[in-house]
């Protein structure tokens, strides 16, 4: 069975969905039961080239003018199933990704879709992908409950199947010497290394890091893509860091590879995720850090308090005093990392995808 994954972004491009697609492709290849390819834009690197995974790159802006070229490239690869990921950073507001299912449906190629977020696109585009889906996968629980009745009817047998995602962070077990070297790179001796990493948007609550941490004792490291010239929110973060009390106590690293992000998180005294909507099972960066044994502070709407199994303290969103107190009490506390947990999770995900792919081919034969 030949499976072609389609994604606008792919490592080393900064995109959570792109990283997810790379992890899924690698897990599918490891089953030794599929031929797996990825169609993506220029700039992608195939870090699994020796495994049998094929990454096809195409100069592409994902606009109307690219639709024919995308479709021809897909058909040339001769997939049994095309699996499109929605959305990705590279798609932006362009329309071609949303019309690919219709083009492939006319060519008789089954299209599986994964919806990583609730679909905010224009009404007719949501209708287009829903009407042309062979099967739909979602990574958020209770997704179907958010859908209108008419939309469920439109999906028919393609109604969403929930397959939880898993951390894309590389497993990391540092020696004490390796951890110390990383700490020395970011934090002066005697200061707590307090880290946030990921995308920086207002709903992530990154600005609260400057209220939770203490510039007298903490070195704040914010890892992720920064564009103060193009983002008013990023400018606001840069202004906070430029304040006299934070000027020497803040570092912006820019975008880090999965390996470097994992090493930084594993070396921290605390990693904080102050999301305004709370974390969920779909937040792979949070799940990944919680396997490293490092102390984590995360916001949540449905649970609060300390989880000893993952060394995580949960607070209500925007409860800055609680997050500040947790940092003071628990910074530097570590537990043994959950070695093997990430690999096992992706093996499960690959098995569930293969079952769905086979069912998709069976439903096509039955029509």
Language model segments and positions:
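A charged, aromatic-enriched C-terminal amphipathic alpha-helix characteristic of glycosyltransferases
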Residues: 331-362
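Nucleotide-activated donor-binding/catalytic signature segment of Leloir-type glycosyltransferases, i.e.
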Residues: 234-259
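Donor nucleotide-sugar binding/catalytic pocket of nucleotide-sugar-dependent glycosyltransferases
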Residues: 134-179, 188, 250
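Glycosyltransferase donor-sugar binding loop
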Residues: 41-44, 219-238
